[in-house]
Regions:
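Short alpha-helices
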Residues: 163-176, 308-323
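General beta-strand structural signal in soluble alpha/beta enzymes
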Residues: 108, 134-137, 158-161, 192, ...
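N-terminal ligand-binding/catalytic initiation module
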Residues: 1-156
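A short, aliphatic-rich alpha-helical micro-motif
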Residues: 127, 185, 252-253, 273-276
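Short, ordered loop/turn segments at secondary-structure junctions
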Residues: 72-74, 82, 111-112, 137-140, ...
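Glycine-rich phosphate/diphosphate-binding loop of Rossmann-like nucleotide-binding domains
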Residues: 77, 84-102, 160, 164, ...
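Rossmann-fold NAD(P)-binding glycine/threonine-rich loop
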Residues: 148, 266-321
Length: 323
């Protein structure tokens, strides 16, 4: 596959009708009768049926196959807090993937609100429109509480894609990579660079699959997450290590079997990859720029099992695979 350039990406989004999604009718509309059934006066009848039995919304409207992809733009890909509007191309892209891979219709909704309570209120207010909510690109730790509350307070499915979608697909990749490497998950040493929603959820699923907490080292922007630190939230405390001999990624990666990167680009050097155990597994999943490029990782050592989140490199680990 050819490398994706800035020019090609901008042209793809702007050529023809701008954007990537549209709304199309599902019923006939060519005659006056069709239009009278679609809207007034015919539309009153399904309204009255739904008033009597709200479940009939699934019979008479698109609700059952309509998902809201909702974001406030505070953690967009590896770009960070770029704002609700700037994140819209990503939400449209997720809508496109829902449609082509799962046949699910999507409205992308960008909410310009960082306060968790107000964001929750906004989602709850529009929830009757949808059959499901897909939370997207919301920063940690707020995303954990937002998802928990919405699951408790809404009567439709709620999923935070960055947590659960990434966890499912990266875990599948890890299981396969361990088979190739001839290693067992309960024995491998795992280094996780990043401590946001995706990293936490991925690592929790690794633990449920058999990885041992004592074999896991997680890092955030301040370095190794250790029990000596006093600035940790609940999610980070769960993964805090007892080790006092490591503080940086360079120190933590020595002898590791697995590297999971959900942080930012170009933080893993070739020397770090060389310092890992035989047949190391490197999942450099930062987007759009991986923690180390595929070319650099493969050049560092021939036995590396390498994956990224990009579709223009081999071994893509991306939520879309789960659709």
């Amino acid at each position: 596959m050819a490398k994706i350039t800035k020019e090609a990406a901008l042209l793809y989004h702007s050529q023809g009708k701008p954007g990537k999604i549209e709304v199309v009718p599902t019923k006939p509309y060519s005659t006056q009768t069709d239009l009278s059934l679609a809207y007034s006066p015919g539309v009153a009848e399904p309204c009255l049926e739904i008033e009597k039995n709200p479940q009939d919304a699934y019979k008479y409207t698109a609700k059952g196959n309509l998902v809201a992809v909702i974001s406030n733009g505070t953690a967009v890909l590896g770009l960070g807090d770029i704002g609700a509007l700037s994140g819209k191309p990503v939400m449209e892209g997720k809508g496109l993937l829902f449609k082509i891979y799962a046949g699910i219709d999507v409205f992308d909704i960008e909410v310009d609100e960082k306060d968790p309570e107000k964001f929750i209120a906004a989602v709850k207010a529009i929830a009757p429109t949808f059959g499901g909510i897909n939370l997207e690109d919301i920063k940690a730790p707020e995303c954990f509480e937002i998802e928990r509350r919405l699951k408790e307070e809404l009567d439709i499915p709620v999923m935070h894609d960055d947590q659960h979608g990434t966890a499912i697909i990266s875990s599948a990749g890890l299981v396969n990579a361990l088979q190739v490497a001839g290693k067992k998950i309960e024995d491998v040493k795992i280094v996780v660079n990043g401590a946001g929603a995706s990293a936490v959820s991925c690592t929790k699923l690794y633990v449920s699959l058999g990885a041992r907490l004592e074999n896991i080292v997680m890092l955030d922007s301040k370095g190794v997450i250790s029990k000596a630190r006093t600035d940790l939230n609940e999610q980070k405390r769960y993964f805090a290590t007892d080790r006092t001999d490591i503080h940086t990624l360079e120190e933590a990666i020595k002898g590791a079997d697995v590297f999971l990167g959900l942080s930012k680009g170009n933080v893993l050097s070739q020397d770090m990859v060389r310092s890992m155990a035989p047949m190391p597994i490197v999942f450099a999943l930062a987007n759009p720029t991986p923690e180390i490029s595929y070319e650099d990782a493969m050049a560092a050592r021939p036995d590396v099992l390498m994956a990224t989140g990009r579709s223009d490199y081999p071994n893509q680990i991306n939520n879309v695979i789960g659709f």
